[in-house]
A protein has these predicted regions:
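N-terminal metal-binding scaffold of metallo-dependent hydrolase/deaminase domains
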Residues: 1-47, 394
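Divalent metal-coordination and catalytic microenvironments
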Residues: 14, 28, 33, 58, ...
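Divalent metal-dependent hydrolysis catalytic cores, especially in the metallo-beta-lactamase
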Residues: 71, 86-115, 127-139, 166-178, ...
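Active-site mouth loops of central-metabolism enzymes
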Residues: 71-82, 145-152, 197
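Short, small-residue-enriched loops and turns at beta-alpha junctions
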Residues: 74-76, 108-109, 140, 146-149, ...
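Histidine/acidic residue-rich metal-binding segments in metalloenzymes
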Residues: 152-259, 266-285, 304-305
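His/Asp/Glu-enriched, well-ordered alpha-helical/loop segment
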Residues: 240-259, 277-289, 294-380
Length: 397
């Protein structure tokens, strides 16, 4: 039984999603900026049981969500304009993403360095949890919405400039392992504690597995490789030419790689997402949004890294060519779709949107409703719509 509750503590009761289970009649105690207790409401002492915040009763309490791949939202894009980045980050925070990595697409070197420097300001201010570079060392054949004219082989001097501009904030970088110099890039990034993530690649299974093994050996952050939005930006799985998907699935099934999954109803079919949860499991999957500036905005025309994007319904596509150009969802939208449309158990979907991405980044302070962790949580209604968001013990909404 829990005892000794501070009179200034916040107590929430409802359905609570912990790392291990869903407590149908649970409680979360927040003291200051920390979670101090999580458990069954029946285990509260008499004094504490009389003090819950009644508005949360009957609702579901989730850990603050963790999105490690997001390009923007609310009309703002992560890049050289820090104000636009703040706008995007606040949009996702209000929808329950309490730890957000800002992603930048490929661009000419000066623009990329400037964008990283601006995002580093947001990391220093606590607005972003880190920076992700999706390029420019990618495959032209699998560039997706990336500008193919900006894609180049790994350049150690450019990487040094980007790392310098990031001031320690670079947490992952997507690369195509078939590019000349890719092995050296893995070593350079790992030394800087940035995770090399395999993606936007046209390589075969052998090359992909070798790259994932090299990242595993170098062990940046928590020691696990990442695969950028698995299935998207790479050859499809074929029984005689398995490609990087086979290597990614095998590595994740062994408990090694973590696979990013854009579960937004547009990037992957429901059966594909269900297969990933059933074969790999939530410990090897990180649900992401891959959201761009159009997230939270009406249909219309937007830009992604300088390229024009047309948004109709839930789909963002390049105006020129029609390639999918990121997503328009928030991470709670992704969780909702996985649970209500795909049939993923709530516990698994939430872990893949919080605990697993936090773990792969080595962030022991966030990602779960556990005593001692930062008090980040999201309260949702029966339709998994956000009701209130708490970050570091302070209500955001």
């Amino acid at each position: 039984m829990m005892t000794g509750v501070d009179d200034t503590a916040t107590m929430l009761t409802g359905r609570v999603v912990t790392p291990e289970r869903v407590l149908d009649d649970g409680a979360v105690l927040v003291e200051g900026d920390r979670i101090s207790w999580v458990g069954r409401r029946a285990d509260l002492d008499d004094r504490s049981a009389e003090r819950p915040d009644d508005w949360a009763e009957g609702r579901t309490i989730l850990p603050g969500l963790v999105d490690v791949h997001c390009h923007g939202g609310a009309g703002g894009e992560f890049g050289a304009d820090p104000d636009a980045g703040r706008t995007a980050a606040m949009h996702h925070l209000r929808h329950g993403t309490t730890s957000l990595v800002g992603s930048l697409v490929s661009a000419p070197a000066p623009s990329l360095v400037a964008g990283v420097a601006a995002c580093a300001e947001l990391v220093a201010a606590g607005v972003l949890a880190g920076i992700h570079l999706e390029g420019p060392f990618l495959s032209v054949a699998r560039c997706g919405a990336q500008d193919p004219t900006t894609l180049v082989d790994p350049d150690p001097s450019l990487v040094d400039a980007l790392l310098t501009a990031a001031h320690g904030g670079l947490v992952q970088m997507t690369f195509a392992p078939e590019r000349s110099g890719a092995a050296e890039l893995v070593d350079q990034l790992a030394t800087a504690r940035a995770i090399p993530a395999v993606g936007h690649t046209d390589c075969d299974a052998v090359v992909a597995r070798s790259a994932l093994d090299r990242v595993l050996e170098r062990g940046p952050r928590a020691g696990r490789p990442l695969v950028t939005h698995v299935f998207n930006g790479m050859p499809p799985l074929h029984h005689r030419s398995p490609g990087p998907v086979a290597a990614a699935l095998g590595s994740a099934a062994r408990g090694e790689a973590v696979l990013e999954v854009v579960g937004d109803s547009e990037h992957l079919a429901p059966e594909t997402v269900r297969m990933l949860f059933e074969t790999v499991g939530p410990d090897g999957l990180a649900l992401i949004t891959d959201a761009m500036a159009a997230s939270g905005m009406p249909e219309g025309r937007f830009r992604l890294g300088g390229r024009e994007v047309v948004v109709e319904g839930r789909t963002a596509r390049l105006a020129d060519g029609g390639a999918i150009a990121g997503g328009v969802a928030t991470l709670i939208d992704v969780v909702r779709w996985c649970v209500t449309e795909v049939g993923v158990p709530l516990h698994d979907a939430v872990n893949a949107a919080s605990r697993t991405p936090a773990a792969v980044m080595g962030w022991a302070d966030v990602g779960a409703l556990e005593p001692g962790r930062r008090a980040d949580l999201l309260v949702v209604d029966d339709g998994y719509e956000p009701v209130r968001v708490l970050r570091a013990g302070a209500w955001v909404t």
